[in-house]
Protein backbone atom coordinates (compact mmCIF):
# COMPACT_ATOMS: atom_id res chain seq x y z
CA UNK A 1 0.00 0.00 0.00
CA UNK A 2 1.32 3.46 -0.92
CA UNK A 3 2.40 5.66 1.95
CA UNK A 4 1.19 9.15 2.81
CA UNK A 5 4.12 11.59 2.99
CA UNK A 6 1.90 14.17 4.69
CA UNK A 7 0.81 11.69 7.38
CA UNK A 8 4.43 10.61 7.79
CA UNK A 9 5.52 14.24 8.22
CA UNK A 10 3.07 14.94 11.06
CA UNK A 11 3.65 11.59 12.79
CA UNK A 12 5.44 12.27 16.07
CA UNK A 13 5.39 16.02 15.56
CA UNK A 14 3.78 18.33 18.11
CA UNK A 15 1.51 21.07 16.80
CA UNK A 16 0.59 24.44 18.35
CA UNK A 17 -2.71 25.90 17.12
CA UNK A 18 -4.10 29.38 17.77
CA UNK A 19 -7.79 30.04 17.19
CA UNK A 20 -8.35 26.37 18.02
CA UNK A 21 -11.92 26.84 19.26
CA UNK A 22 -13.00 28.56 16.03
CA UNK A 23 -14.45 27.04 12.85
CA UNK A 24 -11.06 26.53 11.19
CA UNK A 25 -9.08 25.65 14.31
CA UNK A 26 -11.36 22.94 15.66
CA UNK A 27 -11.58 21.35 12.21
CA UNK A 28 -7.78 21.22 12.00
CA UNK A 29 -7.76 19.41 15.35
CA UNK A 30 -10.36 16.89 14.16
CA UNK A 31 -8.56 16.20 10.88
CA UNK A 32 -5.17 15.65 12.50
CA UNK A 33 -6.57 13.34 15.17
CA UNK A 34 -8.64 11.35 12.69
CA UNK A 35 -6.22 11.00 9.78
CA UNK A 36 -2.80 11.23 11.44
CA UNK A 37 -2.94 8.45 14.07
CA UNK A 38 0.60 9.08 15.29
CA UNK A 39 0.48 12.85 15.46
CA UNK A 40 2.14 14.15 18.60
CA UNK A 41 0.60 16.51 21.14
CA UNK A 42 -1.81 19.19 19.93
CA UNK A 43 -1.27 22.31 22.02
CA UNK A 44 -4.31 24.58 21.75
CA UNK A 45 -4.12 28.24 22.75
CA UNK A 46 -7.29 28.88 24.75
CA UNK A 47 -8.51 31.53 27.12
CA UNK A 48 -10.73 31.30 30.15
CA UNK A 49 -14.13 32.65 29.15
CA UNK A 50 -17.46 33.38 30.82
CA UNK A 51 -16.24 32.04 34.15
CA UNK A 52 -14.97 28.79 32.66
CA UNK A 53 -11.37 27.64 32.93
CA UNK A 54 -9.44 26.45 29.89
CA UNK A 55 -9.80 22.87 31.14
CA UNK A 56 -13.58 23.27 31.30
CA UNK A 57 -13.58 24.81 27.84
CA UNK A 58 -11.49 21.92 26.56
CA UNK A 59 -14.09 19.44 27.83
CA UNK A 60 -16.73 21.48 25.99
CA UNK A 61 -14.58 21.44 22.86
CA UNK A 62 -14.37 17.66 22.95
CA UNK A 63 -18.18 17.56 22.76
CA UNK A 64 -18.21 19.68 19.58
CA UNK A 65 -20.22 18.11 16.75
CA UNK A 66 -17.03 18.00 14.65
CA UNK A 67 -16.05 14.95 16.72
CA UNK A 68 -19.39 13.14 16.30
CA UNK A 69 -17.83 10.38 14.19
CA UNK A 70 -15.11 9.63 16.73
CA UNK A 71 -17.39 7.36 18.77
CA UNK A 72 -18.43 5.42 15.66
CA UNK A 73 -14.78 5.12 14.57
CA UNK A 74 -13.66 4.35 18.15
CA UNK A 75 -11.22 7.24 18.18
CA UNK A 76 -12.21 8.92 21.47
CA UNK A 77 -8.86 7.98 23.03
CA UNK A 78 -7.07 10.26 20.56
CA UNK A 79 -8.71 13.29 22.19
CA UNK A 80 -6.22 12.80 25.04
CA UNK A 81 -3.54 14.20 22.70
CA UNK A 82 -5.06 17.67 23.15
CA UNK A 83 -3.38 19.90 25.74
CA UNK A 84 -4.82 23.36 26.48
CA UNK A 85 -2.42 26.29 26.83
CA UNK A 86 -4.00 29.22 28.62
CA UNK A 87 -3.38 32.45 26.72
CA UNK A 88 -4.71 35.04 24.31
CA UNK A 89 -3.20 36.45 21.10
CA UNK A 90 -4.38 39.88 22.29
CA UNK A 91 -2.03 39.83 25.29
CA UNK A 92 1.71 40.43 25.51
CA UNK A 93 3.68 37.20 25.07
CA UNK A 94 0.32 35.66 24.09
CA UNK A 95 -0.65 35.72 27.77
CA UNK A 96 1.14 32.38 28.22
CA UNK A 97 2.77 31.56 31.56
CA UNK A 98 6.59 31.18 31.58
CA UNK A 99 6.23 27.45 32.30
CA UNK A 100 3.80 26.82 29.42
CA UNK A 101 5.87 28.99 27.09
CA UNK A 102 8.95 26.92 27.83
CA UNK A 103 6.93 23.76 27.13
CA UNK A 104 6.07 25.13 23.69
CA UNK A 105 9.64 26.25 23.02
CA UNK A 106 10.99 22.82 23.89
CA UNK A 107 8.39 20.64 22.20
CA UNK A 108 6.51 22.28 19.32
CA UNK A 109 7.41 21.43 15.73
CA UNK A 110 4.58 22.96 13.67
CA UNK A 111 2.54 26.13 14.29
CA UNK A 112 -0.85 26.87 12.73
CA UNK A 113 -1.87 30.47 13.41
CA UNK A 114 -5.59 30.83 12.70
CA UNK A 115 -6.62 33.22 15.50
CA UNK A 116 -8.06 36.54 14.33
CA UNK A 117 -10.92 38.90 14.90
CA UNK A 118 -13.28 38.62 11.92
CA UNK A 119 -15.49 41.55 12.89
CA UNK A 120 -15.64 44.03 9.99
CA UNK A 121 -16.96 46.70 12.36
CA UNK A 122 -14.31 46.47 15.07
CA UNK A 123 -12.09 49.43 15.87
CA UNK A 124 -8.63 49.77 14.36
CA UNK A 125 -7.16 49.63 17.87
CA UNK A 126 -8.67 46.20 18.53
CA UNK A 127 -7.99 44.70 15.10
CA UNK A 128 -4.40 45.96 15.24
CA UNK A 129 -3.92 44.32 18.62
CA UNK A 130 -5.34 40.94 17.59
CA UNK A 131 -4.66 40.59 13.87
CA UNK A 132 -1.37 42.48 13.52
CA UNK A 133 0.26 42.39 16.94
CA UNK A 134 -1.22 38.95 17.64
CA UNK A 135 0.58 37.62 14.56
CA UNK A 136 3.78 39.35 15.65
CA UNK A 137 3.51 37.68 19.07
CA UNK A 138 3.10 34.28 17.41
CA UNK A 139 6.10 34.96 15.17
CA UNK A 140 8.18 35.98 18.20
CA UNK A 141 7.33 32.67 19.86
CA UNK A 142 8.21 30.80 16.67
CA UNK A 143 11.67 32.39 16.67
CA UNK A 144 12.26 30.91 20.13
CA UNK A 145 11.01 27.39 19.35
CA UNK A 146 13.99 25.05 19.24
CA UNK A 147 12.85 22.66 16.52
CA UNK A 148 10.34 24.50 14.36
CA UNK A 149 9.62 22.69 11.11
CA UNK A 150 6.85 24.93 9.75
CA UNK A 151 4.71 27.99 10.45
CA UNK A 152 1.44 28.30 8.54
CA UNK A 153 -0.41 31.60 8.84
CA UNK A 154 -4.12 31.61 7.98
CA UNK A 155 -4.77 34.89 6.19
CA UNK A 156 -7.69 35.77 3.89
CA UNK A 157 -8.18 36.10 0.15
CA UNK A 158 -9.72 39.49 0.90
CA UNK A 159 -6.56 41.06 2.35
CA UNK A 160 -6.14 42.49 -1.14
CA UNK A 161 -9.82 43.41 -1.53
CA UNK A 162 -8.87 46.68 -3.25
CA UNK A 163 -7.96 44.50 -6.26
CA UNK A 164 -10.48 42.41 -8.18
CA UNK A 165 -7.83 40.13 -9.70
CA UNK A 166 -5.43 38.77 -7.11
CA UNK A 167 -2.38 36.52 -7.49
CA UNK A 168 -0.76 34.15 -4.99
CA UNK A 169 1.99 36.56 -4.00
CA UNK A 170 2.81 39.08 -1.30
CA UNK A 171 1.59 42.59 -2.15
CA UNK A 172 3.23 45.76 -0.77
CA UNK A 173 2.10 46.73 2.72
CA UNK A 174 -0.53 49.49 2.62
CA UNK A 175 1.11 51.22 5.59
CA UNK A 176 4.08 50.86 7.94
CA UNK A 177 3.09 48.27 10.60
CA UNK A 178 5.21 50.05 13.23
CA UNK A 179 3.33 53.28 12.60
CA UNK A 180 -0.05 51.55 12.94
CA UNK A 181 0.99 49.83 16.17
CA UNK A 182 2.29 53.11 17.61
CA UNK A 183 -0.91 54.96 16.69
CA UNK A 184 -3.08 52.21 18.17
CA UNK A 185 -1.12 52.41 21.43
CA UNK A 186 -1.13 56.20 21.75
CA UNK A 187 -4.50 57.31 20.33
CA UNK A 188 -7.99 56.54 21.59
CA UNK A 189 -10.66 54.91 19.42
CA UNK A 190 -12.25 58.22 18.40
CA UNK A 191 -8.97 59.74 17.27
CA UNK A 192 -8.08 56.58 15.35
CA UNK A 193 -11.52 56.55 13.76
CA UNK A 194 -10.87 60.01 12.31
CA UNK A 195 -7.60 58.81 10.78
CA UNK A 196 -9.04 55.57 9.37
CA UNK A 197 -9.86 56.78 5.83
CA UNK A 198 -6.32 58.11 5.40
CA UNK A 199 -4.67 55.01 6.90
CA UNK A 200 -6.83 52.35 5.27
CA UNK A 201 -6.68 53.97 1.83
CA UNK A 202 -8.45 51.52 -0.51
CA UNK A 203 -9.05 48.85 2.12
CA UNK A 204 -12.78 48.45 2.87
CA UNK A 205 -12.38 47.87 6.61
CA UNK A 206 -9.93 47.39 9.48
CA UNK A 207 -10.07 43.59 9.12
CA UNK A 208 -8.59 43.38 5.61
CA UNK A 209 -6.14 46.17 6.44
CA UNK A 210 -4.66 44.55 9.55
CA UNK A 211 -4.70 41.04 8.05
CA UNK A 212 -2.71 42.42 5.09
CA UNK A 213 -0.12 43.90 7.45
CA UNK A 214 0.01 40.61 9.36
CA UNK A 215 1.21 38.80 6.23
CA UNK A 216 4.31 40.98 6.27
CA UNK A 217 5.05 39.90 9.85
CA UNK A 218 5.31 36.34 8.53
CA UNK A 219 7.30 37.43 5.47
CA UNK A 220 9.87 39.05 7.76
CA UNK A 221 10.87 35.68 9.22
CA UNK A 222 10.48 33.48 6.12
CA UNK A 223 14.27 33.32 5.75
CA UNK A 224 14.66 31.91 9.28
CA UNK A 225 12.32 28.91 9.15
CA UNK A 226 9.79 27.39 6.69
CA UNK A 227 6.74 29.64 6.38
CA UNK A 228 3.52 29.47 4.43
CA UNK A 229 0.47 31.70 4.10
CA UNK A 230 -2.92 30.39 3.06
CA UNK A 231 -5.68 32.73 1.92
CA UNK A 232 -9.16 31.21 2.12
CA UNK A 233 -12.12 33.07 0.63
CA UNK A 234 -15.57 32.72 2.27
CA UNK A 235 -15.31 29.49 4.26
CA UNK A 236 -18.44 27.37 4.02
CA UNK A 237 -19.76 24.01 5.23
CA UNK A 238 -17.91 20.73 4.74
CA UNK A 239 -17.82 19.16 1.28
CA UNK A 240 -16.85 15.65 2.40
CA UNK A 241 -15.38 15.65 5.92
CA UNK A 242 -16.00 15.11 8.74
CA UNK A 243 -19.61 14.89 7.52
CA UNK A 244 -20.96 16.41 4.27
CA UNK A 245 -22.69 19.69 5.16
CA UNK A 246 -21.22 19.93 8.66
CA UNK A 247 -20.77 23.48 9.94
CA UNK A 248 -20.69 25.48 13.15
CA UNK A 249 -20.28 28.83 11.38
CA UNK A 250 -23.16 31.24 10.79
CA UNK A 251 -21.11 33.37 8.40
CA UNK A 252 -21.86 33.54 4.68
CA UNK A 253 -24.49 31.28 3.11
CA UNK A 254 -24.91 29.20 6.28
CA UNK A 255 -26.28 32.24 8.10
CA UNK A 256 -28.79 33.24 5.47
CA UNK A 257 -29.87 29.62 4.90
CA UNK A 258 -30.56 29.46 8.62
CA UNK A 259 -32.72 32.60 8.50
CA UNK A 260 -34.45 31.53 5.29
CA UNK A 261 -35.31 28.09 6.66
CA UNK A 262 -36.97 29.77 9.64
CA UNK A 263 -39.10 31.76 7.23
CA UNK A 264 -37.89 35.09 8.65
CA UNK A 265 -35.34 35.93 5.92
CA UNK A 266 -37.21 36.33 2.64
CA UNK A 267 -35.07 38.73 0.64
CA UNK A 268 -31.30 38.80 0.23
CA UNK A 269 -29.23 41.61 -1.36
CA UNK A 270 -27.19 39.59 -3.81
CA UNK A 271 -26.61 39.66 -7.56
CA UNK A 272 -27.10 36.07 -8.77
CA UNK A 273 -25.02 36.73 -11.90
CA UNK A 274 -21.72 37.48 -10.12
CA UNK A 275 -19.25 34.87 -8.89
CA UNK A 276 -19.43 34.19 -5.16
CA UNK A 277 -16.13 32.75 -3.96
CA UNK A 278 -17.02 29.96 -1.53
CA UNK A 279 -14.61 27.29 -0.30
CA UNK A 280 -15.55 24.30 1.92
CA UNK A 281 -13.99 24.07 5.38
CA UNK A 282 -12.47 20.62 4.75
CA UNK A 283 -10.61 21.93 1.69
CA UNK A 284 -9.32 24.85 3.76
CA UNK A 285 -8.06 22.58 6.53
CA UNK A 286 -6.43 20.20 4.06
CA UNK A 287 -4.75 23.21 2.45
CA UNK A 288 -3.35 24.36 5.80
CA UNK A 289 -2.04 20.92 6.72
CA UNK A 290 -0.59 20.33 3.24
CA UNK A 291 1.14 23.73 3.29
CA UNK A 292 2.88 22.85 6.57
CA UNK A 293 4.22 19.66 5.03
CA UNK A 294 5.16 21.36 1.75
CA UNK A 295 7.14 24.31 3.12
CA UNK A 296 9.18 21.91 5.22
CA UNK A 297 9.84 19.64 2.24
CA UNK A 298 11.15 22.65 0.30
CA UNK A 299 13.69 23.33 3.03
CA UNK A 300 14.96 19.76 2.74
CA UNK A 301 15.34 20.21 -1.02
CA UNK A 302 17.06 23.56 -0.46
CA UNK A 303 19.98 22.15 1.49
CA UNK A 304 18.41 22.84 4.87
CA UNK A 305 17.76 26.51 4.12
CA UNK A 306 14.16 27.83 4.13
CA UNK A 307 12.78 28.45 0.65
CA UNK A 308 10.92 31.61 -0.31
CA UNK A 309 7.64 32.38 1.45
CA UNK A 310 4.89 30.18 0.01
CA UNK A 311 1.43 31.69 -0.54
CA UNK A 312 -1.62 29.72 -1.64
CA UNK A 313 -5.20 30.76 -2.41
CA UNK A 314 -7.87 28.43 -1.07
CA UNK A 315 -10.54 29.78 -3.39
CA UNK A 316 -12.97 28.77 -6.14
CA UNK A 317 -13.58 31.82 -8.34
CA UNK A 318 -11.09 31.07 -11.13
CA UNK A 319 -11.26 27.28 -11.04
CA UNK A 320 -14.76 26.19 -10.00
CA UNK A 321 -16.81 29.41 -10.09
CA UNK A 322 -20.21 29.51 -8.43
CA UNK A 323 -23.06 31.87 -9.29
CA UNK A 324 -26.44 31.74 -7.59
CA UNK A 325 -28.17 32.03 -10.96
CA UNK A 326 -27.09 28.43 -11.54
CA UNK A 327 -29.40 27.23 -8.80
CA UNK A 328 -31.71 30.01 -7.57
CA UNK A 329 -34.79 27.79 -7.84
CA UNK A 330 -33.00 24.81 -6.30
CA UNK A 331 -32.19 26.70 -3.09
CA UNK A 332 -35.87 27.03 -2.21
CA UNK A 333 -36.40 23.41 -3.20
CA UNK A 334 -33.66 22.33 -0.78
CA UNK A 335 -35.20 24.47 1.97
CA UNK A 336 -38.39 22.45 1.55
CA UNK A 337 -36.53 19.14 1.32
CA UNK A 338 -35.11 19.83 4.77
CA UNK A 339 -37.60 22.18 6.49
CA UNK A 340 -37.41 23.20 10.13
CA UNK A 341 -39.93 22.08 12.69
CA UNK A 342 -39.31 25.47 14.33
CA UNK A 343 -40.09 27.49 11.16
CA UNK A 344 -42.40 30.43 11.83
CA UNK A 345 -43.49 30.87 8.21
CA UNK A 346 -43.21 29.21 4.80
CA UNK A 347 -39.62 29.63 3.48
CA UNK A 348 -39.31 31.52 0.20
CA UNK A 349 -35.95 33.20 -0.42
CA UNK A 350 -35.48 35.68 -3.24
CA UNK A 351 -32.29 37.42 -4.34
CA UNK A 352 -32.41 41.17 -4.96
CA UNK A 353 -29.76 42.81 -7.17
CA UNK A 354 -30.25 46.37 -5.93
CA UNK A 355 -29.51 47.59 -2.41
CA UNK A 356 -32.25 50.23 -2.45
CA UNK A 357 -34.79 47.70 -3.75
CA UNK A 358 -33.72 45.36 -0.96
CA UNK A 359 -34.24 48.10 1.64
CA UNK A 360 -37.75 48.71 0.30
CA UNK A 361 -38.59 45.01 0.22
CA UNK A 362 -37.09 44.54 3.70
CA UNK A 363 -39.67 46.95 5.12
CA UNK A 364 -42.49 44.88 3.63
CA UNK A 365 -41.15 41.36 4.04
CA UNK A 366 -38.86 41.63 7.06
CA UNK A 367 -39.75 44.49 9.40
CA UNK A 368 -43.55 44.36 9.28
CA UNK A 369 -43.69 40.58 9.88
CA UNK A 370 -40.93 40.91 12.51
CA UNK A 371 -42.91 43.52 14.45
CA UNK A 372 -45.96 41.24 14.44
CA UNK A 373 -44.01 38.10 15.42
CA UNK A 374 -42.04 39.91 18.13
CA UNK A 375 -45.30 41.19 19.59
CA UNK A 376 -46.74 37.67 19.65
CA UNK A 377 -43.51 36.40 21.22
CA UNK A 378 -43.58 39.10 23.89
CA UNK A 379 -47.21 38.37 24.74
CA UNK A 380 -46.29 34.69 25.05
CA UNK A 381 -43.51 35.52 27.52
CA UNK A 382 -40.65 34.97 25.08
CA UNK A 383 -37.74 37.22 24.10
CA UNK A 384 -38.43 39.22 20.92
CA UNK A 385 -35.34 39.31 18.68
CA UNK A 386 -36.49 39.59 15.05
CA UNK A 387 -36.72 43.38 14.78
CA UNK A 388 -33.27 43.73 16.38
CA UNK A 389 -31.87 41.10 14.01
CA UNK A 390 -33.21 42.86 10.91
CA UNK A 391 -31.98 46.24 12.22
CA UNK A 392 -28.47 44.81 12.54
CA UNK A 393 -28.61 43.59 8.93
CA UNK A 394 -29.97 46.96 7.78
CA UNK A 395 -27.25 48.93 9.60
CA UNK A 396 -24.44 46.72 8.28
CA UNK A 397 -25.38 46.93 4.60
CA UNK A 398 -23.32 49.99 3.73
CA UNK A 399 -20.18 48.35 5.12
CA UNK A 400 -20.91 44.98 3.51
CA UNK A 401 -22.01 46.36 0.12
CA UNK A 402 -18.54 45.96 -1.41
CA UNK A 403 -18.42 42.29 -0.41
CA UNK A 404 -21.98 41.63 -1.58
CA UNK A 405 -21.80 43.16 -5.05
CA UNK A 406 -18.12 42.83 -6.04
CA UNK A 407 -16.83 39.94 -8.14
CA UNK A 408 -13.28 38.88 -7.28
CA UNK A 409 -11.01 36.56 -9.23
CA UNK A 410 -8.46 34.88 -6.98
CA UNK A 411 -5.85 33.01 -9.00
CA UNK A 412 -5.16 29.53 -7.58
CA UNK A 413 -2.63 28.13 -10.06
CA UNK A 414 -0.01 27.59 -7.36
CA UNK A 415 -2.43 25.63 -5.18
CA UNK A 416 -3.43 23.42 -8.11
CA UNK A 417 0.25 22.88 -8.91
CA UNK A 418 0.80 21.89 -5.27
CA UNK A 419 -2.03 19.36 -5.53
CA UNK A 420 -0.36 17.77 -8.56
CA UNK A 421 2.85 17.20 -6.57
CA UNK A 422 1.01 14.98 -4.05
CA UNK A 423 0.93 11.23 -4.45
CA UNK A 424 -2.37 9.40 -5.00
CA UNK A 425 -2.85 8.68 -1.29
CA UNK A 426 -2.42 12.29 -0.20
CA UNK A 427 -4.53 13.61 -3.07
CA UNK A 428 -7.39 11.58 -1.66
CA UNK A 429 -6.72 11.99 2.06
CA UNK A 430 -5.78 15.69 1.99
CA UNK A 431 -7.80 16.79 -1.05
CA UNK A 432 -7.35 20.42 -2.08
CA UNK A 433 -8.53 20.14 -5.70
CA UNK A 434 -12.24 21.05 -5.93
CA UNK A 435 -12.57 20.10 -9.60
CA UNK A 436 -15.11 17.37 -8.79
CA UNK A 437 -17.22 19.51 -6.46
CA UNK A 438 -20.88 19.60 -7.61
CA UNK A 439 -22.36 22.84 -6.29
CA UNK A 440 -25.99 21.69 -6.37
CA UNK A 441 -25.30 18.56 -4.30
CA UNK A 442 -22.99 20.58 -2.05
CA UNK A 443 -25.65 23.17 -1.19
CA UNK A 444 -28.26 20.48 -0.63
CA UNK A 445 -25.93 18.96 1.97
CA UNK A 446 -25.17 22.41 3.39
CA UNK A 447 -28.84 23.17 4.01
CA UNK A 448 -29.24 19.79 5.72
CA UNK A 449 -26.11 20.55 7.75
CA UNK A 450 -27.45 23.96 8.76
CA UNK A 451 -30.63 22.21 9.92
CA UNK A 452 -28.72 19.69 12.04
CA UNK A 453 -25.77 21.66 13.39
CA UNK A 454 -26.92 25.29 13.54
CA UNK A 455 -30.68 24.99 14.04
CA UNK A 456 -30.11 21.86 16.17
CA UNK A 457 -32.96 19.87 14.63
CA UNK A 458 -32.43 16.08 14.47
CA UNK A 459 -33.17 13.95 11.42
CA UNK A 460 -35.84 12.07 13.37
CA UNK A 461 -38.22 15.07 13.29
CA UNK A 462 -37.81 15.66 9.54
CA UNK A 463 -41.11 14.05 8.51
CA UNK A 464 -42.94 16.05 11.16
CA UNK A 465 -41.27 19.21 9.84
CA UNK A 466 -42.31 18.36 6.28
CA UNK A 467 -45.93 18.04 7.38
CA UNK A 468 -45.68 21.44 9.05
CA UNK A 469 -44.09 22.84 5.87
CA UNK A 470 -47.19 21.84 3.90
CA UNK A 471 -49.44 23.51 6.46
CA UNK A 472 -47.34 26.69 6.26
CA UNK A 473 -47.63 26.57 2.46
CA UNK A 474 -51.42 26.49 2.78
CA UNK A 475 -51.36 29.44 5.17
CA UNK A 476 -48.93 31.29 2.89
CA UNK A 477 -51.21 30.85 -0.14
CA UNK A 478 -54.29 31.78 1.90
CA UNK A 479 -52.61 34.96 3.14
CA UNK A 480 -51.59 35.94 -0.39
CA UNK A 481 -55.10 35.37 -1.73
CA UNK A 482 -56.57 37.38 1.15
CA UNK A 483 -54.08 40.19 0.61
CA UNK A 484 -54.74 40.51 -3.12
CA UNK A 485 -58.47 40.25 -2.62
CA UNK A 486 -58.18 43.11 -0.13
CA UNK A 487 -56.14 45.14 -2.64
CA UNK A 488 -58.75 44.42 -5.31
CA UNK A 489 -61.61 45.63 -3.07
CA UNK A 490 -59.59 48.69 -2.04
CA UNK A 491 -59.01 49.67 -5.69
CA UNK A 492 -62.71 49.42 -6.42
CA UNK A 493 -63.61 51.34 -3.25
CA UNK A 494 -61.09 54.17 -3.67
CA UNK A 495 -61.34 54.69 -7.44
CA UNK A 496 -64.96 53.79 -8.07
CA UNK A 497 -63.97 51.85 -11.21
CA UNK A 498 -65.75 48.68 -12.18
CA UNK A 499 -64.62 45.30 -10.95
CA UNK A 500 -63.68 44.38 -14.52
CA UNK A 501 -61.29 47.35 -14.80
CA UNK A 502 -59.93 46.67 -11.32
CA UNK A 503 -59.22 43.13 -12.42
CA UNK A 504 -57.04 44.55 -15.22
CA UNK A 505 -55.09 46.76 -12.79
CA UNK A 506 -54.44 43.95 -10.35
CA UNK A 507 -51.94 41.98 -12.53
CA UNK A 508 -49.89 45.14 -13.04
CA UNK A 509 -49.68 45.69 -9.29
CA UNK A 510 -48.88 42.03 -8.78
CA UNK A 511 -46.00 42.30 -11.27
CA UNK A 512 -44.60 45.45 -9.66
CA UNK A 513 -44.93 43.92 -6.21
CA UNK A 514 -43.09 40.85 -7.47
CA UNK A 515 -40.04 42.98 -8.27
CA UNK A 516 -39.51 43.56 -4.57
UniProtKB/Swiss-Prot annotation:
Presence of the UniProt keyword Membrane in the record: yes
An example Gene Ontology CC term for this record: membrane
Keywords: Lipid biosynthesis, Lipid metabolism, Membrane, NADP, Oxidoreductase, Transmembrane, Transmembrane helix
Record's keyword annotation contains NADP: yes
Record-linked SUPFAM superfamilies: NAD(P)-binding Rossmann-fold domains
Residues spanning the membrane: 356-376, 471-491, 496-516
GO annotation (BP), single: long-chain fatty-acyl-CoA metabolic process
Catalytic reaction annotation: a long-chain fatty acyl-CoA + 2 NADPH + 2 H(+) = a long-chain primary fatty alcohol + 2 NADP(+) + CoA
One function term, GO molecular function aspect: alcohol-forming very long-chain fatty acyl-CoA reductase activity
Membrane topology reported for the UniProt record: Multi-pass membrane protein
Enzyme Commission number(s) of this protein: 1.2.1.84
PANTHER family referenced in this protein's UniProt entry, alphabetically: FATTY ACYL-COA REDUCTASE CG8306-RELATED, MALE STERILITY PROTEIN 2-RELATED
Function: Catalyzes the reduction of C16 or C18 fatty acyl-CoA to fatty alcohols.
Similarity annotation: Belongs to the fatty acyl-CoA reductase family.
Protein name: Putative fatty acyl-CoA reductase CG8306
Organism whose genome encodes this protein: Drosophila melanogaster (Fruit fly)
Amino acid sequence: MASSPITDFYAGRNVFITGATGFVGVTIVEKLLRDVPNVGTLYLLMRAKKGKSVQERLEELKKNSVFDKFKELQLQSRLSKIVPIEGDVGLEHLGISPKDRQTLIDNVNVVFHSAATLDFFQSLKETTNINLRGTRRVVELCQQIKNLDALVHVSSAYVNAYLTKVEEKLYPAPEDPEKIIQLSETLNDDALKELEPKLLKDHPNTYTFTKHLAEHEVANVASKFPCGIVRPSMITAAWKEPIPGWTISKNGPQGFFMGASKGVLRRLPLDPSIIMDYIPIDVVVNGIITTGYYVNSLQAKNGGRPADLQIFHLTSSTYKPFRFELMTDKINSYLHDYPLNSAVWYPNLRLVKSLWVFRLSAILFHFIPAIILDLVTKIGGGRPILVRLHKNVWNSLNTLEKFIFTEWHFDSKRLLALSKTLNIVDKKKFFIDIGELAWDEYFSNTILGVRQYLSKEPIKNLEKARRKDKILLGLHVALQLSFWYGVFKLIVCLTGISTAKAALVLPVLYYLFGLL
